[in-house]
Amino acid sequence: MAEEKSFKYVIVGGGVAAGYAAREFFNQGVKPGELAIISREQVPPYERPALSKGYIHLENKATLPNFYVAAGIGGERQFPQWYKEKGIELILGTEIVKADLAAKTLVSGTGQVFKYQTLLAATGSSVIRLSDFGVPGADAKNIFYLRELEDADYLAYAMETKEKGKAVVVGGGYIGLELGAALKANNLDVTMVYPEPWCMPRLFTAGIASFYEGYYANKGINIVKGTVASGFTTNSNGEVTEVKLKDGRTLEADIVIVGVGGRPIISLFKDQVEEEKGGLKTDGFFKTSLPDVYAIGDVATFPMKLYNEMRRVEHVDHARKSAEQAVKAIKAAEEGNSIPEYDYLPYFYSRAFDLSWQFYGDNVGESVLFGDNDPESPKPKFGSYWIKERKVVGAFLEGGSPEENNAIAKLARAQPSVESLEVLSKEGLSFATNI
């Protein structure tokens, strides 16, 4: 049997949250040999959002070191040597298959045993696959999902070998929109397919979505709405050649990319800690129902102080900030001190083609569109506010400057009162910049 290893702190998972937790442990003075990161991936933590942006653009020839944590915030990049110098043990290519939280023991797929005093669950999410729904042919070659570096490498290789071929993107959310743009930029003929009446329906209003759909159409991307992929045709090599749609149509395809959502990976901890809304229930310090187990990033369901409700957030900004909060809380508790509870302002952003948008707050209540949302404008700039109980609770802005984006963030946190939707529509962005 493999030798048992013991650490004061163990982070399970090797994504963004894990990397930023390691960074904060170092900032808090962790001693060499106290901390280990155990990750299924073969590389140190990196900025996962880059996979659907810079990394997948073949002309850029971007390489991984550019995306190591903490490149996303302009911090020092954490190369493998960074962890070694800090005395942080990186245990890569290692999947934990069993967690006994009562015994504070983890077991890997090869039988290696790890003991800890404090555990941080940073296991992230897994992609939802079409095979999960029993879609015929969903395991064909050249059907891709994007979650990890290896996925991006396989996709990039296919994009190069199938240059000027036909690509079908299944899904109209974040991944669908970003990869649709990336595929087009890499000279593929792109069709997007999604069942909803417009793209990004969890965030976008119909007015916001109409701009992006128009912009993508002007770039030559074909959009098929209101139907789903119901099957795939393959050639003698098992490679996908067609996507069959539920409405009876078929689409030629050399490459298919699927982005239909993710699921938090919490099976290791099942029936050992409290769960809520699909994640591990935590307090405002990311401590679970077990005092020495913390959950950060995608897997944490935490108190959203601003809205007085429990939420789970899948986003890089929260992954970074929850990691920092948890580590600060752990170290403060050890010293008999306390820190303020997590007070998170929801934040989402995306970049595709020459576009760049940011959103802050909550997209609930009535919405008001302002600005120039004509897809054919040379420099489109528009936004939206969400109003609930006569207060502005959310704000979206496309094409904003850093100062303007900061203004909508401040607005979303301040939640100012508003006289009427008409006034807000007329004032537009100036309502935020004058707060």
UniProtKB/Swiss-Prot annotation:
Keywords on record: Cytoplasm, FAD, Flavoprotein, NAD, NADP, Oxidoreductase, Phosphoprotein, Redox-active center
Cofactor: FAD
Binding residues annotated for NAD(+), in chain numbering: G172, G173, Y174, I175, G176, L177, E178, E196, R202, G261, E314, H315, Y349
Entry EC no(s): 1.6.5.4
Reactions listed under catalytic activity: 2 monodehydro-L-ascorbate radical + NADH + H(+) = 2 L-ascorbate + NAD(+)
Intracellular or extracellular location(s): Cytoplasm
GO CC field: chloroplast stroma; cytosol; plasma membrane
UniProt-annotated binding residues for FAD: G14, G15, V16, A17, E41, R48, K53, I96, R147, E148, D298, V316, Y349
UniProt-annotated binding residues for NADP(+): Y174, I175, G176, L177, E178, R202, G261, E314, H315, Y349
One Pfam family per UniProt: Pyr_redox_2
Binding site for L-ascorbate: R320, R351
Top EC group: oxidoreductase
GO BP terms: response to zinc ion
GO molecular function, one term: monodehydroascorbate reductase (NADH) activity
Inducing factors: Down-regulated by atrazine.
Residue positions, PTM Phosphoserine: S417
Role, per record: Catalyzes the conversion of monodehydroascorbate to ascorbate, oxidizing NADH in the process.
PANTHER family referenced in this protein's UniProt entry, alphabetically: APOPTOSIS-INDUCING FACTOR 1 (PTHR43557), MONODEHYDROASCORBATE REDUCTASE 2-RELATED (PTHR43557:SF13)
Family, per entry: Belongs to the FAD-dependent oxidoreductase family.
Name used for this protein in its record: Monodehydroascorbate reductase 2
